[in-house]
Amino acid sequence: MTLPENAYHDRLGDYFAQLAGASPYNAHTDRPATLALAGDVAGRHVLDLGCGAGHYTADLLDRGARVTAVDGSATLLRHARDRVGDRAELRRHDLDTPLDFAADATYDGAVCALVYHHVTARAQLLAELRRVLRPGGWLVLSTTHPTAEWLHHGGSNFDDAWVDARLPDPSLTIRYQRLTLEALLGEWLAAGFTLDRLVEPRPLPQLRDVDEARYEKLSQEPSFLAVRLLTSAR
């Protein structure tokens, strides 16, 4: 099997599984803000796209959702299984391919947290989400903030290059595409979604006691963008 480039395999998967548990960026900033946009999920069937090590899946389950969680990495799915056991349906799936495991109008909502910028076939993914979501369904999606990317990389704000970013462990890199706000909103609206809410996640107050420097930085410079998108109630 060819390993999808948008997944975190082997040591990279283990690295992110450990990092996501308590990271200022994940645990204290993106995750609470993104899941807040999902709202009341009790009794709802939710698709967790790019579920990683299962942190968002576990929270959705604890809130009473029925969850189908997918990821392209066997390594991360192993961590997700350790976290949620058999409480969720876990599937290995490359998000650059159609969601052929799901019938039309299967899910009440979907969560796609910090995954979108890794996907190449984004128009296809959005079309597939429109297909598998029920009428009036929702998609909660978070991604890197275009301003944060511009501040970090410099140059043109409109650069849409693919980036191979080196991590603190210099032997590990992740690949993603820089996307402008114009590109993001354009893709979502062109796919037929309507924008319900948009937030620039701030860190939880508890982070100040854990890492004051990161708390101050994340309170002043947005790292992520999160949206709640709706399908039509056809």
Language-model region placement:
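A short SAM/SAH-binding and catalytic strip from SAM-dependent methyltransferases
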Residues: 109-122
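A short acidic, Gly/Pro-enriched loop at the edge of an enzyme's catalytic core
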Residues: 99-110
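C-terminal lobe and adjacent flexible extensions of AdoMet/dcAdoMet transferase-like proteins
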Residues: 191-234
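Short alpha-helix
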Residues: 175-198
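Conserved class I S-adenosyl-L-methionine
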Residues: 1-42, 55, 59, 76-79, 138-166
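Class I SAM-dependent methyltransferase SAM/SAH-binding core
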Residues: 47, 53-98
